[in-house]
């Protein structure tokens, strides 16, 4: 995750702003600079290489002292920064909006995936600039639309029906912020269209998840799509979701946290997010993740007989 101010800076033109991507040498200069505390939140002028991000964001970049940040000297950093600028320059950002826009925390990996989709000549985003920019504006939280299959970050499609598409996320192969744990496995499920779904299509998805992904929990980050994650990573997701929810609540103007379909979501996660929305503490909410829940009656009669027992997947073992 990183603020948009880590990728670009605003330049006032008439009554709105044009956004310009940082170059890696300007960032490198900022990372070595001594800056007064009162100037930590201001864009840094490297004199030689142009404007650099505010020094308060130093930890967002990979250095000898911090291996958890972005690999800003890669070509992918420049591609992501340029893509963000293209999207921001396609809309009007006024002086009253600019600080709020640049403070938005975004998923670096999501944006890298959109670059990869853009470069794939078989992908619809390669052929449609409007759809590409729409996808980026959704990714950076500047649109109230949800991420659907067409505007999704992408990955490897492992399941699809008339209503849903399930993607295996490819973060292990990333340049900018790769996942270093080689055991990482995670999926995302997007709706093909933002409209009411038929019961039969929901039933197909639940059957697929129950039999092929029975070692995983289905959760949501509240943005209109599902995530399918290892049970061992659920607590980590809970910390991130709670922190983001609280931050958005504090800053105001947040998009409503979408609990999604209770029949698809893991029961304990639904309890966690419901408790979070009620304003309870992180400790209180997280207790629900490890509490034994009363099993719900099967919402779809006959679902358990859709697959034979010998078809149960070994994925995740």
Swiss-Prot record:
Active-site annotation: 225
Annotated residues for binding of ATP: 107-109, 188, 221-223, 227
Subcellular location: Host cytoplasm
SUPFAM superfamilies in the record: Rotavirus NSP2 fragment, C-terminal domain, Rotavirus NSP2 fragment, N-terminal domain
Region (RNA-binding): 205-241
GO cellular component, one term: host cell cytoplasm
Major enzyme class: hydrolase
GO biological process, one term: viral genome replication
Record-listed E.C. numbers: 3.6.4.-
Disulfide bond residue pairs: none
Domain of life: Viruses
Keywords per UniProt: ATP-binding, Host cytoplasm, Hydrolase, Magnesium, Metal-binding, Nucleotide-binding, RNA-binding
Cofactor(s) needed: Mg(2+)
Any one Gene Ontology molecular-function term assigned to this protein's record: nucleoside diphosphate kinase activity
Leader peptide range in chain numbering: none
Its job: Participates in replication and packaging of the viral genome. Plays a crucial role, together with NSP5, in the formation of virus factories (viroplasms), which are large inclusions in the host cytoplasm where replication intermediates are assembled and viral RNA replication takes place. Displays ssRNA binding, NTPase, RNA triphosphatase (RTPase) and ATP-independent helix-unwinding activities. The unwinding activity may prepare and organize plus-strand RNAs for packaging and replication by removing interfering secondary structures.
HAMAP family linked to this entry: ROTA_NSP2
Family membership noted in the UniProt record: Belongs to the rotavirus NSP2 family.
Subunit structure: Homooctamer. Interacts with VP1; this interaction is weak. Interacts with NSP5; this interaction leads to up-regulation of NSP5 phosphorylation and formation of viral factories. Interacts with host DCP1A, DCP1B, DDX6, EDC4 and EIF2S1/eIF2-alpha; these interactions are probably part of the sequestration of some host SGs and PBs proteins in viral factories.
Name the UniProt record assigns to this protein: Non-structural protein 2
Organism per entry: Rotavirus A (isolate RVA/Human/Belgium/B4106/2000/G3P11[14])
